[in-house]
Design a protein with these regions (language model features):
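Extracytoplasmic/periplasmic substrate-recognition and gating elements
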Residues: 172-235
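A ligand-binding cleft/hinge motif common to bilobed small-molecule-binding domains
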Residues: 6-12, 164-177
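Paired acidic/hydrophobic, glycine-rich loop segments that form the ligand-binding mouth/hinge
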Residues: 1-2, 158-163, 179
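Hinge/lid segment of periplasmic solute-binding proteins
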Residues: 3-56, 68, 179-183
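Short helices/loops that flank or line small-molecule/ion binding pockets
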Residues: 9-10, 14, 64, 78-82, ...
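Extracytoplasmic/periplasmic solute-binding protein
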Residues: 46-56, 74-118, 157-159
Length: 311
């Protein structure tokens, strides 16, 4: 049976998933690190990645930005300012906000008991917060969600972060200037750090109640192998977790999926409880409003509220 990766802990605790024991190393090698992470809990692989297409990356207008510009956030902002354009990101949304913290090595995950771990208020988190504040204070930055991005890219906006679900609208707006790539690096503590992200995957699991686990594993492996994922992409447009399919000419011809595949190397599964989203959004909104005079206190509050919500 298939399941979204954010259900893995519930299924494991219900003893519903059979551990992958056949061709485990091969399956790990054939799929992206982010997808394998999504199918793994407490060091055990519990499923076969099928897709890896629920995530985010950078859309950009290549009449304004070069391939070199989009490698770094500094490059994007400098080129945007020079052209009188804006870079857009929904900083007041915890899903996107986390990219800075995750990129700088912070943790937002669950422990073995299913409790939320969030260390955004440590030294690395503070450095990431300072980078977010610098972004929000930059004249070429424009905060806002996906409606703003897909409506204004090609006009006031030259680049923005979102997912595949707006690719058709962005492509229509930009035409021949349509481009996409992985997220950029950002300046953090005087160094360039790659932005992280969340990646959502569909996973095929083997039911522990099966009387034929070997045959079930063989079937699951077949249904998620390279050829099956390629056919699924060609017929349905699903983004592959298989590294060979992700690197194929077929996927490369779809800039959004190619960008998502490139970003997946820096993505983690969304093991996040509901208590994170509201305080994270509030933290981002404060920085957008230029209210970041005591970042450490703000981070302490974010983490306290995130963890307290589960008690």
């Amino acid at each position: 049976f298939s399941y979204p990766d954010d259900q893995i802990i519930t299924l494991v605790k219900a003893d519903a998933l059979y551990e992958v024991t056949r061709n485990r190393d091969q399956i790990i090698a054939e799929n992206s690190a982010g997808a394998i992470n999504a199918a793994t809990y407490d060091g055990v692989l519990y499923g076969y990645p099928m897709t890896a297409d629920n995530g985010y990356f950078l859309y950009y207008d290549k009449s304004v930005l070069t391939e070199e510009d989009v490698q770094t956030l500094d490059g994007i902002l400098a080129a945007a300012e020079k052209a009188g354009k804006k870079f857009n990101m929904d900083v007041a949304n915890g899903w996107y906000l986390a990219s800075f913290f995750l990129g700088n090595g912070c943790q937002l995950t669950l422990d073995a008991d299913g409790k939320q771990i969030c260390d955004f208020n440590n030294e690395k988190g503070l450095a990431a917060a300072e980078a977010i504040k610098a972004l929000c204070d930059h004249p070429a930055f424009l905060a806002g969600g996906q409606d703003l991005l897909q409506g204004s890219i090609g006009d006031t906006i030259c680049a923005g972060i979102c997912g595949t679900w707006i690719s058709s609208a962005v492509k229509e707006k930009l035409g021949d200037n349509y481009a996409a790539c992985k997220l950029p690096t950002f300046t953090c503590g005087g160094e360039q750090v790659q932005m992280g992200s969340f990646l959502g995957c569909k996973i095929l699991g083997v039911n522990t109640q099966t009387a034929h686990p070997v045959e079930a594993m063989e079937l699951a492996e077949y249904l998620t192998n390279e050829q099956s994922q390629l056919r699924r992409f060609e017929a349905l447009g699903y983004g592959p977790s298989n590294v060979n399919v992700a690197a194929s000419e077929a996927v490369a011809s779809e800039p959004a999926l190619a960008a998502l595949a490139a970003q997946s190397a820096y993505a983690i599964s969304q093991h996040v409880l509901g208590g994170y989203w509201t305080p994270a959004g509030a933290f981002g909104a404060e920085l957008v409003a230029h209210n970041g005079s005591d970042l450490q206190a703000m981070l302490d509050q974010l983490v306290e509220q995130t963890v307290a919500a589960q008690n």
